[in-house]
Amino acid sequence: MKPLQYAIIGGTGVYESGVSSFQKTVETEYGEVEVDIAEVKKDSIVFLARHGKEHGTLPHRINYRANLKALQKLGVQQIFATAAVGSLNPDFPTGSLVVLSDFLDMTKQRPLTFFEDGSEGAKHVNMDDPYCANLRKHLLEAAKRHDVQFKGNAVYICTEGPRFETEAEIKMMREWGADVVGMTSVPEVVLAKELGLCYASVGFVVNMAPGMDSGPIQLESIGEMLARNKEK
């Protein structure tokens, strides 16, 4: 098997790599993680379904630390992730793709760090480039080669979930500068940074956030948008 330098973390709607692969169980101090190992051209790539293959794990119950530790244990250095998002920005309509460039954190009860007990001393990870600029550049270059259009860079705000946001919350988030909202990129991006892993994420806009269009969020419409974006 070739070295495992790259990983894809599939979010809502992306539950498999789409190529021939075999399953592997990785043991970590935070629990077991199931991944798929796929060979793509000259590289072996790890695929991890964030919510599980059947989407059985809600955002606030995902074992983010186990997932990231498993990838590190396999030797992964670069992670490409996907995330279904709601749009707070009229320039990012339903069905569009964005590249996450920064984040705001509104999560409440998730383990956010590998350094909880202080046994390694005070650890303050620099977050001035949370979503790796180099990987974002590669994403945009690959998209151009394959005629896939990104609407632009987006500031992502992460909520606890699993409920959707209120109109009042969305109004506040827009004032804070958020472009899209989701429930999973934090603490994933933070934990990757703590482990020294390069991490980038594509946002699939599956709905306009509450108060941004004429009606309530329709789960059926979200499913349709996920299927459409998966092909991209």
Predicted segments with their positions:
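A C-terminal functional module that forms or caps the active site or interfaces directly
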Residues: 167-208
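Short, hinge-like loop/turn segments at secondary-structure boundaries
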Residues: 96-101, 198-201, 217-220
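His/Asp/Glu-rich mid-to-C-terminal helical/loop segments that flank catalytic regions of hydrolases
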Residues: 210-232
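Active-site rim beta-loop-alpha module in soluble metabolic enzymes
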Residues: 130-175
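Short, acidic/turn-prone active-site loops that include or flank metal/cofactor-
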Residues: 102-105, 204-210
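Polyanion-binding loop/helix "lid" in catalytic or ligand-binding cores
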Residues: 120-131, 170, 225-232
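Metabolite-binding pocket within alpha/beta catalytic cores that recognizes anionic/polar moieties
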Residues: 1-127
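Short, flexible loop segments at the rims of nucleotide/cofactor-binding pockets, characterized by
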Residues: 55-60, 157-160, 178
